[in-house]
Amino acid sequence: MYQQLIKQIKTSDEIIPVNFNISNIDCLLVYSSNIGDIKEFNSYYFPKININNLYQLNNIFPGIVTKDKDPKNIFNDLSKGFIFLFTSPEDYFKFNLPISNNRSIETSVIDPIDLFSSQDGFIEDLDTNIALIRKHLSNQDVFVEYYTLNNVEKNKVALVSLKGYNNYNEEIKSKLNQINNKNVTSINTINKQFQGKHFVPMTLSTSSVQNVSLSIMKGKTAILLDGSPVSSIVPVNLFLFSTMKTDVNTPIYYSFFSRLLVLLFLIISVFLLGFYVALINFHTSSLTIYSLSNLKLTEKGTTLPMFLEISIILMLFELYRYATSRSSSGYIQNIIIFLGGLFIGQNAIKSGLIGPLILLLTSICYLSTFAFTNNLHLITTISLSRIFVISFSYFLGLYGFLISAILIFTYLLSTKSFDKEYFFDGSISLKNKVKEYFTPAEGNNNE
């Protein structure tokens, strides 16, 4: 009776078909031995099944059992822990009984560590992640909408937002509909849909439950993917990538000082080297003789043009960053850092490749990037912007420096994340915008 069906379903050894009989009615049980909880089924559900309720199991066990006739999604459901009970080759019930093999909740590894805030981090189970958000936000206005991607694996996504602010959900779902990947296992696949051709990141990735909760209360939407321990937040702006989750709870003088420094670090990381190159190459008359003599002394022994010196240092820094990020253990990272310390420093200066002042300024610019943000996409964007400013400054002097700065600010001012300005929200007065940034308050919806 079920031979043809078994031949279609049993494509792998872990898929187990079992024929059995209930009051002379032939039935078939199908489950995955690694994912479906057959022990739970045998101990609790199977003893309660008899001829009187065999065709009403979805009413006997509501929420656990569903009735279906479409065999198209059987393979996907088996991989998610469903157990199938066929009463005929055309009719079946599926029991949602996955084996619980989730890892324990741990601290987020991609967000800055803060001992004064919640240490909860997302895991690879969507239901657990939603429960963690609900633990932080018991507000009835928090709205959760589930969505299934239109791909082969039918990956499950949850959109979490605040009622009255979930007007982005339709646009988000239209973006998700365009995903063509057979199996979406990383949140980066979803981020790519929102990125498009933008030069700056259009989503904020975080695995901190508190970060997501605060963002939702500020009117943003969190996108969670089943199987991923990372959430994406939209819409975003430039300064969202530099904020800490405890900024809203710190004294005004502390938040003002820290955000002033963060803003200064952004300016230094992008513009300091370009300004120095323009000044030295074209406008030495603006410097005193004492300053010029000191600069010449620091560059004594170097044979390469300033542009090449800076390029070599930046390439070495990027080399160590990528080498460290691709290493699998702290032991290897320590070796890379040790070797980097040997290569960059006194040995590089003695070799005549670079000067000490250029090395110092380039190091300050590069480190300032990490003081502003830990978002890898934005770090790369800042690095490319720095090279853009240096190139214009090297060939056109201060005119090139000003042109590059104007072009960068023009691009940021014209960029939007959904309907929100990326750099500056024109609907809010400059005075209020500055006040909101430097003195953040919990519940502020405009950041």
Where are these regions (language model features)?
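Glycine-centered flexibility sites
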Residues: 81, 117, 121, 219, ...
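Broad structural signal for hydrophobic residues in well-ordered alpha-helices, predominantly aliphatic
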Residues: 5, 172, 319-320, 392
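Transmembrane alpha-helical segments that form the functional core of multipass membrane systems
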Residues: 237-373, 377-387
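Membrane-embedded alpha-helical signal segments
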Residues: 1-271, 275, 279, 286-289, ...
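Hydrophobic alpha-helical transmembrane segments of membrane transport and translocation systems
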Residues: 354-358, 362-447
